[in-house]
Regions:
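Glycoside hydrolase catalytic-domain groove-lining segments
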Residues: 54, 65, 69-75, 86-121
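Cytoplasmic membrane-interface segments at the C-terminal ends of transmembrane helices
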Residues: 82-83
Length: 121
């Protein structure tokens, strides 16, 4: 699965480059709080933080590596949907940092219907 992610990302971004399109930002996955490409990259609910996050991190690494290979200066976004849960965000990015993921921007979704209208999140 890791190689598929790498090749797909590489091929997709190469098409942009071949068309003369510069890409400023790439978001690896979408709302990946619980992982990506379920069930393979789902964050586990057992084991150490390292074990829980391992598959997600390896998938993200491949997408990031392919992006950097085609567009080295492109900003990488990791996007979660838990902006109303500070502890979850802190845990998630502490895990991402344990794996030394190469990202530039933290993206967070905010849904007032579920997270309330208190903007002091």
């Amino acid at each position: 699965m890791q190689n598929i992610i790498f090749e797909y990302t590489l091929t997709s971004l190469q098409k942009f480059k071949d068309a003369g399109i510069e890409v400023d930002f790439v978001q690896i996955g979408n709302e990946i709080t619980n992982g990506l490409l379920f069930p393979y990259g789902k964050i586990k609910n057992y084991g150490s933080d390292y074990q829980k996050f391992f598959d997600t991190a390896k998938f993200l690494e491949k997408g990031i590596l392919a992006t950097r290979q085609i567009f080295p200066e492109t900003k990488i976004i990791l996007h979660l949907d838990c902006s109303g849960d500070l502890n979850r965000c802190l845990w998630w990015f502490s895990c991402a940092n344990q794996f030394d993921l190469d990202y530039d921007i933290i993206g967070l979704s905010y849904y007032s219907l579920w997270q309330g209208k208190d903007l002091r999140l």
